[in-house]
Design a protein with these regions (language model features):
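Conserved GNAT-fold acetyl-CoA-binding loop/helix
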Residues: 32-54
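A short helix-loop-beta-strand connector motif used in the catalytic cores of GNAT acetyltransferases and
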Residues: 56-68
Length: 175
């Protein structure tokens, strides 16, 4: 599949590159970044490499997936935003989830909203997704605010069976 790149005011959303592994692994080794992901466990470099490989396979199979997100000004990787299948939450399947994760230095600058807006528009307009969900663990209200800013509404409150943590599921339906 041809490369996809989306440029926003401050960000570039693009496919993953080999040189992304080290900054991605560093982000996923930060306990504060990983606090609200699954059971809150940090990831090893090997797990991160596998995640990038899986993301690229997802792209090849579906024509969309997780974008690596870099700052346009510095061309440094600051996180990701895009699409995955939330198989960890069987009660909402089948679904496509929009997700994001950013390095701590990128928090509070509006990057998650900027990236998620661009990715969501790509999924709905360019790839014809009809419904997209997003999930956050109760306590991580910053992610909930991003969901609301990009036009999503609360759909369900439930428990993540893999972590036992309460989560809120938001969705948006393209009419």
């Amino acid at each position: 599949m041809r490369s996809v790149e989306i440029k926003t005011n401050k960000l570039c959303l693009r496919r993953w590159k080999a040189e992304d592994i080290d900054p991605f692994a560093n982000m996923c080794a930060d306990p504060e970044v990983m606090k609200w992901i699954g059971s809150g466990v940090v990831r090893t470099r090997e797990e991160c490499l596998l995640a990038i490989e899986n993301s690229e396979h997802f792209w090849e199979e579906n024509g969309f997936g997780l974008f690596a997100v870099e700052l346009r000004e510095t061309q440094s990787l600051i996180g990701f935003s895009g699409f995955a299948v939330p198989s960890f939450l069987p009660e909402i399947m089948p679904s496509i989830e929009i997700a994001w994760r950013f390095v701590r230095d990128a928090w509070g600058h509006g990057y998650a909203t900027e990236a998620a807006t661009a990715a969501l528009n790509f999924g709905l307009k360019e790839r014809g997704l009809e419904r997209v969900v997003s999930i956050y663990q109760v306590g991580n209200e910053a992610s909930g605010r991003v969901m609301e800013k990009i036009g999503m509404s609360l759909y369900l409150e439930t428990i993540d069976p893999s972590s036992g943590r309460p989560v809120k599921v938001y969705d948006i339906v393209e009419l």
